[in-house]
């Protein structure tokens, strides 16, 4: 499994998990976060390996579709980069430090 894809799926899952069914959440979490194999997930849920594979592929597409429409993850990445740039350029500015702190709390970055 590609590490970039795994990281992306885990990130998208963090943003959009609430929009998935319980089965989709379980399969994606076990496969990407817990590193279960398709066979292990199939055994756990008493379904075929092919059923797990199909569900995971469908769910990956759903997560990508949510991101394409809502941009929550990509917007978060941009905000994080802006926060980091401000903190680097103005490390001693208490006003900006305070505002960044508020925004990061809202953004759940901590």
Swiss-Prot record:
InterPro entries: RNA_pol_sigma_r3/r4-like, UPF0122, UPF0122_fam_protein, WH-like_DNA-bd_sf
Molecular-function GO term, any one: GTPase regulator activity
Pfam families to which the protein is assigned, alphabetical: UPF0122
HAMAP family: UPF0122
Protein family (similarity comment): Belongs to the UPF0122 family.
Classification via NCBIfam families: PRK00118.1-1, PRK00118.1-4, PRK00118.1-6, YlxM
Protein role: Might take part in the signal recognition particle (SRP) pathway. This is inferred from the conservation of its genetic proximity to ftsY/ffh. May be a regulatory protein.
Name listed for the protein in its UniProt record: UPF0122 protein SMU_1061
């Amino acid at each position: 499994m590609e590490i970039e894809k795994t990281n992306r799926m885990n990130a998208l899952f963090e943003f959009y998990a609430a929009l998935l069914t319980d089965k989709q959440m379980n399969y994606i979490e076990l496969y990407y976060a817990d590193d279960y194999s398709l066979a292990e997930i199939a055994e756990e849920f008493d379904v075929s390996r092919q059923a797990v594979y199909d569900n995971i592929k469908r769910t990956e597409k759903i997560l990508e579709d949510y991101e394409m429409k809502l941009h929550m993850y990509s917007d978060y990445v941009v905000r994080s980069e802006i926060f980091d740039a401000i903190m680097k350029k103005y490390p001693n500015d208490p006003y900006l430090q305070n505002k960044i702190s508020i925004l990061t709390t809202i953004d759940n970055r901590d």
